[in-house]
């Protein structure tokens, strides 16, 4: 968001809310409804079933939501801009290959991202439009080739955000 604000020359305000649940859709709907009534244009949920309520609130408010885990546009084709995909199949394939190569995989933590094609955004993007989609894909490329390194924690984010000013 900070990167987009700088690129667009706009002030974008982020309002983070926590549902303290991954399954309570009614809580997600209540939080998103309040955010929309307070002037929020887009709500990005990252909380499993809670997000179903967020998407329902977006439909009712005629606003936008960003889905998570898989392409959730089918839930509200006029309201889900895009989704943050977790391509678990790719992670399973990578770990399986290590196991098949005889490497010890137990007791390890694996972190996969864009470089491993384990996360991304859906190719379908009619609500985003071609220009926004192509800009996002270009940023994915910059992350993959390490031209841009996304911050991994609050301290890195604060430093990154300061560098954008």
Where are the model-predicted features located?
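A residue-level marker of the well-folded mature domains of exported/periplasmic proteins
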Residues: 1-165
């Amino acid at each position: 968001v900070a990167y987009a604000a700088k690129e667009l020359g706009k002030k974008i305000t982020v309002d983070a809310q926590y549902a303290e649940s991954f399954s309570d859709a009614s809580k997600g709907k209540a939080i998103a409804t309040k955010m929309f009534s307070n002037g929020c244009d887009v709500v990005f949920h990252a909380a499993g079933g809670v997000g179903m309520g967020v998407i329902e609130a977006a439909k009712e408010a005629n606003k936008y939501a960003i889905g998570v885990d898989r392409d959730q546009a089918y839930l509200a084709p006029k309201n889900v801009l895009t989704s943050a995909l977790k391509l678990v199949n790719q992670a399973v394939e990578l770990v399986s290959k290590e196991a098949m190569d005889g490497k010890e995989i137990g007791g390890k933590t694996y972190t996969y991202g864009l470089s491993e094609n384990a996360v991304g955004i859906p190719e379908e993007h009619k609500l985003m439009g071609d220009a926004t989609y192509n800009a996002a894909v270009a940023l994915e490329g910059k992350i993959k080739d390490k031209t841009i390194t996304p911050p991994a924690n609050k301290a890195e984010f604060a430093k990154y955000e300061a560098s954008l000013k």
